[in-house]
Each structure stands twice: as structure tokens, then as C-alpha cells.
A protein has these predicted regions:
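Intrinsically disordered, compositionally biased charged tails
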Residues: 1-19
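Structured, basic alpha/beta domains of bacterial-type, RNA-associated proteins
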Residues: 14-26, 32-83, 88, 92-145
Length: 145
């Protein structure tokens, strides 16, 4: 029998990122490791183009936002590894990592990206469930009689 699984897998993309800047971004429980270098505007997430990895148009706009703010959407190539959380957290972590890497390329971009709050880590996370309650804040149904 032939191994049909290996034929259906997408080929690994080899990218040269020798002269790149590295940064990590975080959001909720997601962590993004980002390598940024001068290039043609391609963004790879876990070996796939970001359009294929993230299906939502909202996430596409969110990820390209740092480049749109500095008007250099086609000047950088991005390779990143994202783990943990869901799509929204992963997209947020990716934006945070890209922004930090852009600041490493050019310190003058720091004030521009900071005013848009892209270099600041969004510390909001899910609140833990408390004992004696149904959820974090929701209590059990109360019956007078």
C-alpha cells in the first residue's frame, strides 16, 4: 500500500532569515515568536501564509496593521511560530511581536507604534473561577423558598 498521507502534506518552506530581528509577542495564553527582515511583504505563520492560517478578515487586517501605520506594508518579510490559545489571541500575539521587531529595526518607529498601543502587552486574560460560585463572578441560582 502507498502512503497517501505524505503526498497530501504541504511542502516545508525554507526561508533564509539570517539578517533578521527576533521578538516575542504575547496575548491571552498565546505566544508568538517573530523573525522580521527586509523583503517583499510575505507573512508566514507556522509555515503557512497568514491568509491561509487565519480565516477571518478581521485577523488579516489586525496582523497587517503595524505595517499600514508605518506605510511599509511591502518592505518586510515575517516568519513566526505561534502556539497556545485561539485565533484572536494568536493574532494579537503576532501583532505585538511584529511591532516589537519593527522597533528593533528602527527606534524612530517606537513613538508611532506606542501611540497606537501596539508595543504594549495587552494583559487582559480570562478571570479564574472562584469557589462557591458558578463561574468567575456568576453565583449559583438563589431561591428564597
Amino acid at each position: 500500500m502507498e502512503n497517501t498521507q505524505s503526498a497530501s502534506k504541504t511542502p516545508k518552506i525554507k526561508l533564509d532569515f539570517k539578517d533578521s530581528k527576533y521578538a516575542t509577542g504575547r496575548r491571552k495564553t498565546s505566544i508568538a515568536k517573530v523573525w522580521l527582515k527586509k523583503g517583499s511583504g510575505k507573512i508566514y505563520v507556522n509555515g503557512k501564509l497568514f491568509n491561509e492560517y487565519f480565516s477571518s478578515e478581521f485577523h488579516h487586517l489586525q496582523i497587517t496593521r503595524p505595517f499600514d501605520i508605518i506605510n511599509q506594508s511591502t518592505n518586510f518579510d515575517v516568519r513566526c511560530s505561534v502556539s497556545g490559545g485561539g485565533p484572536t489571541g494568536q493574532a494579537g500575539a503576532l501583532v505585538h511581536g511584529i511591532s516589537k521587531a519593527l522597533v528593533m529595526f528602527d527606534e524612530n518607529l517606537k513613538s508611532t507604534l506606542k501611540t497606537e498601543k501596539l508595543t504594549t502587552r495587552d494583559s487582559r486574560a480570562v478571570e479564574r473561577k472562584k469557589p462557591g460560585r458558578r463561574k468567575a463572578r456568576r453565583s449559583f441560582q438563589f431561591s428564597k423558598r
